[in-house]
Amino acid sequence: MKTGIGQPVRRKEDARLVVGAGRFSDDVDLPRQTRAFVLRSCHAHARIKSITTERAKALKGVLAVLTGADLKADGVKPIPPDASTTMPYEAQRRLPDVVLVHRDGPLMQTPYYPLAVDKVRYVGEGVALVVAETLAIAKDAAELVDIDYEALAPATDTALAAEAKAPRVWDEAPSNIFLDAEVGDAATTDKAFADAAHVVKLETWVQRVTGVPMEARTAVGNYDKPSGRYFLHAGSGGVVRQKGELASILGVKPEDVRVVAYDIGGNFGTKNSIFAEFPLVLWASKRVGRPVKFVCERSEAFLSDYQGRDLVAKVELALDKRGHFLAMRGSHLSNIGGYSSSIVPLRKGVSIFSGVYRVPVAHYKAYAVVSNTMPTIPYRSAGRPEAMFIMERLCDLAALKTGIDRIEIRRRNLVAPEQLPYRTPFGVTYDNGNYEEAMNRSMAMADWEEFRKRRADSKKKGKLRGIGLANYIELTMGYPREWSQVKVLPGGEVEVAVGTLSSGQGHETSFAQCVSEWLGVPFESIRLVQGDTDIIPVGGGSHSGRSMRMAGVCMGNAANGVIERSRQIAAHMLKVEPDDVEFSAGSFKARGSGRAVGIFEVARAAQELNDLDDALRGPLAAESDVSFTAGGYPYGCAVCEVEIDPQTGALEVVRYCAIDDV
């Protein structure tokens, strides 16, 4: 089909988005809506001695000034961490990741209330919520809130926070070390290092970052008193998970919460975890009896959006005299911030520590440390880029140490196609790939062999020129369960409902191409349904390269279900046996005759024919609900070439080439 899988088509989303007809969170306004403003901590670490709100409440137009004490009094519960900190050991073993077991038993859970209660643990943590008729009034009222802090020494540096003498982020904890785990074979690894001809070492810090999506986080919440239901419209990475989390925080049944998100202006992982303002606007709406809207400003987003990376690594690589890798050992120290929101980046990075290279034995120590910083969560590949950076730097250091060309030392140690499936020392199994071919093709695209000439030309201009190469592998999985429903409507439209949620990935287009090919229906006839928990019962959202991989399977299963049910209805219509009905290009044909019915005719018959079996009557739809256990291992290679002006330090990326096998 010209609009099927792999065909170049115009994106379905763009016709709506380029004319400003998208429906983002800030486009939503409800009748009698109020505005909320969060007063945030100016301290990284401090006890809250008192909060005085009387002057703020007296300001005309102020409807409520709420604190952590009010929140606890109303029974609002902490924001739950992701499953990485709470999942039982046996459940973790069923996933493709390395299991990190804390040496001192179960992990301590750090209650993360939507507003700080007794103590603030990072700059930007919410301390009070002001609800007013307008945002300007709410901001003015926030300036009238008096907070008496007892400032405490903060622990912000990742390495220093892990030291025994560091200020305690949590008074009840013996140290700031939240997780202390190790994986691999220490004795065998140490012997390999003792016998090695060469050892290279790397100590590095991968800095903290945040996502900065084009659409800042926004939440519009409403409590409907007659039904007792909460409604939230907020851009996120997946509405179903957030529905469950909100129900947990508010202490209600999941069916009493509806979460909606239509167009999402970027994510990068920062929107996959629930933000404090999401339960706050719902709770505040119940308190004031009106809808409440919160819109995060860019300046406060830098303080209070979830953040990523922040990893201190100390790693060694052992080699024999011919440059073959013998072993790796080291430690990863992940700064998870003031609360134990996630250890996924640490776990993922350790899982694929060796990249696409053969490393016979290894031993790693993995630490997570709490600090007086914004919590970190899975962000843009969650720990894997850090691991790839570390491994590729070790390759370059090994080349310098041994005198072997940096490309040749990689070739000698790449996992070869005939060695796949390949099991790493930590038990992760790469299923397939051709890593050397990806490297070769990237180098060819980058014209690697002619680099010396280009560098000489730059030198004549007084410029420096450099080129670098990095091989990489991913481990995609994320939330392991996904769902889809495919429904063929008599009027010539196909509805495809999914539990994923696009934030710019183009699901309306790519998913429609898949279903168009499978059902043989026009690309234009397919409508994607997503982002509404009253319609979508199951789904993990979009993260970790899971959307097409998981939703594609579910959509394919559901499409097959529609075809098989349609075959039986078509057999009834054509007066033949189901085995004598062939399906092709959207039509069901009676074998050996010219008689046929289209899939939309079948959909109409399913609802109109009275002599159909009860099992075949009704809307022509099928569902698929699948739990996945196997990870995916996309891989590739990137080459970057830069030119630098040594007088000014100005850097220009003059060439970038990459091969990515998904």
For the regions a language model picked out, list residue spans one by one:
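Active-site rim segments in enzyme catalytic domains, especially the processed small/beta chain
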Residues: 77-83, 93-95, 252-305, 345, ...
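Gly/Pro-rich active-site capping loops and adjacent beta-alpha segments
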Residues: 2, 73, 103-105, 110-113, ...
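Helix-loop-helix junctions that connect adjacent transmembrane helices in secondary transporters/permeases
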Residues: 165-250, 414-493
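Flexible, low-hydrophobicity surface segments
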Residues: 1-178, 199-202, 277, 287
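Active-site-proximal alpha-helical scaffold in enzymes
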Residues: 131-132, 276-282, 313-324
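Short, well-ordered beta-strand elements within core beta-sheets of diverse protein domains
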Residues: 35-48, 126-132, 380, 391, ...
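Short, well-structured alpha-helical segments that form the helix of a local strand-helix-strand
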Residues: 405-413
